[in-house]
């Protein structure tokens, strides 16, 4: 597995600088990868992989956490229309409890790459952990603010997960999933205390495991 020392200097790159430097190394099909939902008490962790055409412009695309829900949805549609390929993967609460959140996140990222209709020859990954694939790759801390491909993936992952959690609102009423998307806010914690965990709660997470009955 190859790694590149792309930025020996401290100069802050533009959102396409990582992609441009990787292309100059001879790679043509670069996938940005990010996840949404590592921290919540309920629901899956969702990962997205996005391959953008060379030179594409996506005004407004940045780290999904910095965008309003309305803007994220608008940019989701723009990315889906502009990208060369988009793949989405997920790991449910059961898998998270079984193998831990880090390994479940990497599994979701691996699945997202496998769902791409174009095989990538290089991966740019948000964070510090590499995906278990024999594809050249680089991890980038805060990559969703530094790479356009990763920023696009962060929006796809976030919107995809939010929509899934809104669907869970009707399947598991009483927890308020549409509002908090599974995060551990006061109202969600109160609902867990009153109703107990449901099927999509992460039963090894603090805030949930205290309410898991022994027979479960």
Curated annotation (Swiss-Prot):
Belongs to the RNase HII family. Endonuclease that specifically degrades the RNA of RNA-DNA hybrids. GO terms for cellular component: cytoplasm; ribonuclease H2 complex. InterPro entries: RNase_HII, RNase_HII/HIII, RNase_HII/HIII_dom, RNaseH-like_sf, RNaseH_sf. One of its GO terms (molecular function) is RNA-DNA hybrid ribonuclease activity. Residues 28-216 form the RNase H type-2 domain. It comes from the Bacteria. This is Ribonuclease HII. Its cofactor is Mn(2+); Mg(2+). Its EC number is 3.1.26.4. It is an enzyme of class 3 (hydrolase). It is found in: Cytoplasm. Manganese or magnesium. Binds 1 divalent metal ion per monomer in the absence of substrate. May bind a second metal ion after substrate binding. Pfam families: RNase_HII. Its main location: cytoplasm. A divalent metal cation binds at residues 34-35, 126. Keywords: Cytoplasm, Endonuclease, Hydrolase, Manganese, Metal-binding, Nuclease. It catalyses: Endonucleolytic cleavage to 5'-phosphomonoester. The keyword Acetylation does not apply. HAMAP family: RNase_HII_B.
């Amino acid at each position: 597995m190859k790694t590149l020392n792309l930025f020996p200097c401290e100069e802050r790159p533009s959102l396409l600088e990582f992609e441009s430097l990787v292309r100059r190394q001879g790679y043509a099909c670069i996938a940005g990868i990010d996840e949404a939902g590592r921290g919540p008490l309920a629901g899956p962790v969702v990962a997205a992989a996005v391959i953008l055409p060379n030179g594409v412009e996506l005004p407004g695309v940045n780290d999904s956490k910095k965008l309003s829900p309305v803007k994220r949805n608008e940019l989701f549609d723009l990315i889906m229309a502009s990208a060369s390929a988009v793949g989405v993967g997920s790991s449910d609460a059961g898998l998270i409890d079984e193998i831990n959140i880090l390994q479940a996140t990497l599994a979701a990222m691996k699945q997202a790459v496998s769902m791409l209709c174009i095989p990538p020859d290089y991966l740019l990954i948000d964070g510090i952990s590499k995906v278990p694939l024999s594809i050249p790759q680089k991890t980038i801390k805060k990559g969703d603010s530094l790479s356009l491909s990763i920023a696009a993936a962060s929006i796809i992952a976030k919107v995809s997960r939010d929509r899934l959690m809104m669907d869970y609102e009707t399947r598991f009423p009483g927890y308020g999933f549409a509002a908090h998307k599974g995060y551990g806010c006061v109202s969600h914690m109160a609902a867990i205390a009153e109703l107990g965990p449901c099927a999509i709660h992460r039963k090894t997470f603090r805030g949930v495991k205290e309410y898991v009955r022994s027979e479960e």
